[in-house]
Amino acid sequence: MKSTPLALAGLILMAVLVCVSTSQADIVAYWSFDEGSGDAAEDGSENGNDGTVFGAEWVDGKFGKVLEFDANYVLVPNDESYNFTQDQDFSIILWINYEARGDWQGVLQKFNGGYPFKVEVNPSNSLYCAIWDQTNNPGAHVGNVSGDWHHFAFVRDRSEKKIYSYLDGQLQETKDDTINGTTENAADLYIGARKPGNTILFYGTLDEIAIYNRVLTEAEILSAVQGNIPDVSLAVSPRSCLGTTWGGIKIQYY
């Protein structure tokens, strides 16, 4: 079957737009820290959630370059893409290697009154993530895993009213999601600190941080542990759809 060049162009455009929208809609921020130098931590999603590095050092790490924190931080301006509401699903994944200091350490936080999430190390050196509506504060831990690289994942499934924590791809805790009030705030996002004023600082290294506006499956989390970050390949380069798209169109029309 033959078709006009204009019709073919339209088909290609529609297919690529569908591919891009389905691959990019779910990942709202992704920091690979592969820049290796400079004061910018670029967001690999389409949302432009780039961060500014304040003092953290670029070093070799788990996958290529990583950021090492010694009472330093990255500031990401507030954005609605990760300012999750009280009824919104979301997931967070990251690689972490931290020091056991017997004190609070802010890892990834949007903290100001109620908050949609905070990843933190507590004084027992346990890594966890929590949500707060200024009354209820559900959180899920993975224990003291300091001193070596580990993959941490936190998942909120609002339909099930559950939150989950994973360590190296394995489920650690399942807790009730008791949130019933506002979690949104106007705070910026800090990587390596808690909040404005740069209190509750982090000591360690971080890599491959990704935030999603949906529930990640256990299979996807295991894939991330193996280095395959869900949704990232197409979010970073929408053109990667094009080869498959064009191949399918050629089969159909020629």
What are these model-predicted stretches?
Residues D177-T178:
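Residue-level structural signal for beta-strand termini and adjacent loop
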Residues V142-N144:
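Short, flexible loop/turn segments at beta-strand junctions in immunoglobulin-like
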Residues K2-N72, E173, L222-Y254:
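Extracytoplasmic low-complexity segments
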Residues V28, S32, S37-A41, D70-Y128, ...:
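Extracellular glycan-recognition modules
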